């Protein structure tokens, strides 16, 4: 059984037992999460969401991605700027897909 869920502005294809990286979700590790914005379950497609469909998961890890370095330099002056950014993420293991 598979489903397409929407979380963090992205659409993700999931199956039971999959581990997925999503944008940061509130919650502690080992806590349960529910995704109710389900776009499709097997061959049932919603308009825009499938009513009554829920995907259950468990938060495995809260973390940050690798650092991305942004460097700006204006060659006509001495202005230089170096920034770093680490995007927070949540690792979720899909435990159950409940469809229609």
Curated annotation (Swiss-Prot):
GO terms for molecular function: rRNA binding; structural constituent of ribosome. Keywords: Ribonucleoprotein, Ribosomal protein, RNA-binding, rRNA-binding. GO terms for biological process: translation. InterPro entries: bL21-like (IPR028909), bL21-like_sf (IPR036164), Ribosomal_bL21 (IPR001787). It holds the Pfam family Ribosomal_L21p. GO terms for cellular component: cytoplasm; ribonucleoprotein complex; ribosome. This protein binds to 23S rRNA in the presence of protein L20. Part of the 50S ribosomal subunit. Contacts protein L20. Belongs to the bacterial ribosomal protein bL21 family. This is Large ribosomal subunit protein bL21.
